[in-house]
């Protein structure tokens, strides 16, 4: 494995079986490139860059449609990104989720082991809920009703571009 920081090579080390590697380096903003070799040939390259300030909220899901049966749930991943679309790992803004349509916000999460706030609404017909992001990430669970519709989820935070996502609910 070879490590390069801002164009300066810090050296190449052999990976011990089931082990790890470490280099002595002083933190500086920029780009770190790790290049893996096997039998002298490059087999992988991974790059990590320092991000710019948080700029926008991006919401993603692997399911664009859920069943309108009152039970089906869509997991939405929320990312706080910089202007280049990179997750900002130190961004922890308060996110407010708003849902329009025949569904509800079932719960939220942020992965912060020290977060003691509520992770689900007190009422069963919740259409707005807030939680801080943690390390640039959060999740929100959206549950269908029995009525097919298009659910519109938005997320806002101070000084960030709003994120939005449409989820279709369909009869079984």
Describe each PLM feature range:
Residues 1-45, 61-62, 80-84:
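Long hydrophobic segments that form regular secondary structure
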Residues 4-8, 44-47, 73, 84-121:
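Short flexible loop/turn segments that cap and initiate beta-strands
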Residues 18, 68-71:
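Solvent-exposed, conformationally flexible loop/turn segments
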Residues 22-27, 124-146:
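Short, hydrophobic beta-strand segments
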Residues 29-30, 146-152:
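Short tyrosine-centred short linear motifs in exposed loops/low-complexity segments
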Residues 35, 71-89, 95, 151-155:
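Beta-strand-rich structural segments
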Residues 40-52, 161-171:
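Edge beta-strands of extracellular beta-sandwich domains
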Residues 51-69:
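Low-complexity, acidic Ser/Thr/Pro/Gly-rich terminal tails and inter-domain linkers that flank the onset
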